[in-house]
């Protein structure tokens, strides 16, 4: 493909590292609820250097981060060069770790969940499903920074070891009763916030694990839609005043300034060394299909990166 030419108000970024996201795979398979117009070059985030500032006030050679949602979801990130709106560009320090910075979108999602999806909740205790995943590990770090006691659910000893290393209490869902362990670890009080990307039948159990006035925050449906009468389940726990809220980054589409606040917060934490994005396999850009196969196996720990 030819190197794109930046239009008015755009810059050209030469890629250093490209983050691979789960919804890249959903777009490829046609299962993403917000499908873009086809043909479409996927990708969600990139770090790199300005190759052509195009009179925007940015500087050639400057280290930068850019996310797809800041560039009007135009895609094009699985490439050596990206033409992006100057307003989508986030400058990074010259000595920033550009590999780890290419995994920051997970933290932006985690910030959106905690700061807006869970608005009104100040969790003393939070439970995270899939705590060894990309968003899960980010939630552990942000939860701990917020002063919460964090309990992470994972499905293997290896993943539980990672959850523990990241500073959370781990529950092995393949060996333990999740509800029983949450009850034990919270002294019977339950969790103020439960972050759930699974949906399916897990919601019913989550309702029994909530503290009074607690919230189950749903941000995915990997397990499909729930089959139970969820309202009946919630009514059975009515003395706890349980709540369920659904979140997506598209919740910010009509208020992008809120998403900007999340990104700004994450970049500040990254620059200050307060968060440590976890990296997984790093593959050549030409092996994007292999990266998607790794994601589909759902055994990868850490963010998959592509390198031009």
Where are these regions (language model features)?
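Glycine-rich beta-strand-centered segment in the early N-terminal region that forms part
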Residues: 2-20, 31-70
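Short, well-ordered loop/turn sites that connect or cap secondary structure elements
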Residues: 57-58, 120, 210
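Short glycine-centered segments of the SAM/dcSAM-binding site in methyltransferase folds
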Residues: 63, 125, 149, 214-215, ...
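N-terminal Rossmann-like NAD(P) cofactor-binding module of classical short-chain dehydrogenase/reductase
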Residues: 65, 127, 194-195, 217
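Mid-domain Rossmann-like dinucleotide-binding core that forms the NAD(H)/NADP(H) cofactor-binding site
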Residues: 100-176
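Short amphipathic alpha-helix with an adjacent loop that forms part of the alpha/beta core around
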Residues: 178-188
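Glycine-rich phosphate-binding loop and adjacent beta-alpha segment
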Residues: 201-274, 308
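C-terminal capping/lid region of NAD(P)-dependent oxidoreductase domains
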Residues: 267-268, 272-282, 289-308
């Amino acid at each position: 493909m030819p190197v794109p030419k930046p239009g008015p108000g755009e810059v050209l970024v030469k890629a250093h590292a490209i983050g691979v996201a789960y919804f890249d795979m959903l777009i490829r398979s046609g299962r993403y609820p917000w499908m873009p117009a086809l043909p479409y070059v996927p990708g969600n985030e990139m770090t790199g250097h300005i190759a052509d500032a195009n009179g925007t006030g940015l500087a050639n050679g400057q280290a930068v981060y850019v996310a797809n949602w800041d560039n009007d979801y135009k895609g094009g990130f699985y490439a050596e060069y990206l033409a992006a709106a100057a307003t989508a560009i986030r400058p990074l320090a010259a000595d920033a770790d550009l590999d780890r910075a290419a995994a920051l979108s997970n933290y932006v999602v985690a910030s959106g969940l905690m700061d807006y999806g869970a608005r009104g909740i100040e969790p003393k205790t939070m439970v995270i499903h899939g705590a060894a995943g990309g968003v899960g590990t980010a939630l552990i770090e942000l939860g701990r920074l917020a002063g919460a006691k964090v309990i992470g659910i994972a499905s293997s000893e290896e993943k539980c070891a990672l959850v523990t290393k990241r500073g959370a209490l781990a529950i092995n869902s393949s060996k333990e009763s999740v509800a029983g362990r949450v009850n034990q670890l919270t002294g019977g009080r339950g969790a103020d916030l439960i972050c759930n990307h699974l949906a399916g039948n897990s919601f019913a159990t989550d309702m029994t694990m909530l503290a009074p006035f607690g919230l189950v925050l749903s941000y995915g449906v990997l397990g499909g839609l729930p089959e139970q009468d969820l309202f009946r389940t919630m009514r059975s726990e009515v003395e706890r005043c349980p709540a369920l809220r659904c979140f997506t980054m598209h919740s910010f589409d009509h208020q992008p300034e809120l998403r900007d606040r999340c990104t700004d917060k994450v970049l500040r934490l990254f620059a200050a060394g307060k968060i440590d994005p976890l990296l997984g396999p790093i593959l050549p850009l030409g092996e994007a299909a292999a990266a998607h196969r790794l994601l589909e196996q759902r055994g990868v720990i850490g963010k998959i990166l592509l390198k031009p």
